[in-house]
Amino acid sequence: MAASSSSSSSMASPRGRSIRETVLETVAAYHQQQRMRRKFRKSLSYAGELSSAGRARGEGGASSSASTTSLCGPDEDDEPFWEEEEGTVELVQLGANRAKNVLILMSDTGGGHRASAQAIKDPFRIEFGDDYRVFVKDLCKDHAGWPLNNMESSYKFMVKHVQLWKVAFHTTSPRWVHCFYLAALASFYAKKVEAGLKKYKPDIIISVHPLMQHIPLWVLKWQGLQNRVVFVTVITDLNTCHPTWFHADVNRCYCPSEEVAKRAALDDLQPSQIRVFGLPIRPSFCRAVLVKDDLRKELELDPELPAVLLMGGGEGMGPVKKTAKALGESLFDKELGKPIGQLIVICGRNKTLSSSLQALEWKIPIKVRGFETQMEKWMGACDCIITKAGPGTIAEALIRGLPIILNDFIPGQEVGNVPYVVDNGAGVFSKSSRETAKLVARWFGPDSDELKRMSEKALKLAQPEAVFDIVRDIHELSREQGVISQISSSLTSSFFIPSPETTPIQLM
């Protein structure tokens, strides 16, 4: 351990030393520590063999002596693992170029967390090929117990009873409340979470959920891995954030807006930990070159009529049917006897809603769709969007330059998304289906200039490169994590190998 301590000192104070000398000393210290661990395990194994031999033969002195020579004699680990020739350093390290494991922690409490996780996964492959292996997992669902493994159904129940969710959101906001609550859960499930981390052997952990910071970070700290595993948080709320998003021990906290960054600073995160890049959105939204006329032809839309996109989220929630019927009336010009616009309705998984809309008589062109995986095409083919204030949908609409009409929000985390859109001139808020329909009719008629201005402001507010900026910064963090992290092929071995210098720490 003294060698390791000396190594840390040399890295912290490199003045008067060359980088080459520092690297060599650090590598040597790390290798010595690994050799000590292996010899410790062998000594335990040897003691077990002596005990077994004594019981079997009664008198095993000669045999034991031979075993001692075999176990403690020359070891291949004692050979130099670097060679210095003509001023160069060659590191001979098995697995030095191995792919790093990235574990993205999420939970299906709303569709935004999984969408953000999947959005982050793809750029690792696009930017860095096979350098990273990315796993998207609900760690609490797979490796914890109640209530952590039941968050998805609990969340769905509470958002259907919004006042209940509002109470839960605000009563758990004080730090002492949620820290006590999470510490209590950790006392029951930390070992199971540790087993989950062990399964994936992460070099990098990315949390896209507010409850996926505390327990994994505590596990890393107990195992002495907080300085070896890169841990970052990607916040998926545009404005209003629950305080559990912010943890002072993360390497980075990626904020989607300046307002969120200010909240992070108030929760003791340092400027070096905070980055403002935007909300991570799938590369198919960010970089695809989509022409509206081509998309309308592909999706079998009327090429001449402006189109409004009405969304009810993944579950088809909200006043979708009522708003659709109001749009069916307002977008039909009775004097001319023809439609002035067309309607696309995304019903998500709500098959009842989809069937009821398809059964109605319509005076305007309409497309009724279920759960869609290519929203970039439908958004690209439309001229404006009506949706609840979900952060992912808002960010996608901004990238497509769609003026937004927000018709609902979930109390708590979605409240701040309304002023984020409205104050930046990218949309309006209206809970009245009739007023919403009248507004769309004006945008498609005499107020078309207002629609154009809002489209320009939406594009200005958009951050299409956010997900690539996040992934590149994580890549740089991983490279800067330290010489030990870069050269070791068994970075997370401490999850599995007990150190002779330490004993496991248990949370009581």
Swiss-Prot record:
Enzyme class: transferase
Assigned EC number: 2.4.1.46
Main location: plastid
GO cellular component: a single term: chloroplast membrane
Gene Ontology terms, MF aspect: 1,2-diacylglycerol 3-beta-galactosyltransferase activity
InterPro entries with a match to the protein in the record: Diacylglyc_glucosyltr_N, Glyco_trans_28_C, Glycosyltransf_28_UgtP
Transit peptide: 1-60
Protein keywords: Chloroplast, Glycosyltransferase, Membrane, Plastid, Transferase, Transit peptide
Pfam families: Glyco_tran_28_C, MGDG_synth
GO biological process, alphabetically ordered: glycolipid biosynthetic process
Location(s) in or outside the cell: Plastid, Chloroplast membrane
Catalytic activity: a 1,2-diacyl-sn-glycerol + UDP-alpha-D-galactose = a 1,2-diacyl-3-O-(beta-D-galactosyl)-sn-glycerol + UDP + H(+)
Residue ranges of the region described as Disordered: 51-79
Stated family: Belongs to the glycosyltransferase 28 family.
Protein's job: Involved in the synthesis of the major structural component of photosynthetic membranes.
Protein name listed in UniProt: Probable monogalactosyldiacylglycerol synthase 3, chloroplastic
Annotated source species: Oryza sativa subsp. japonica (Rice)
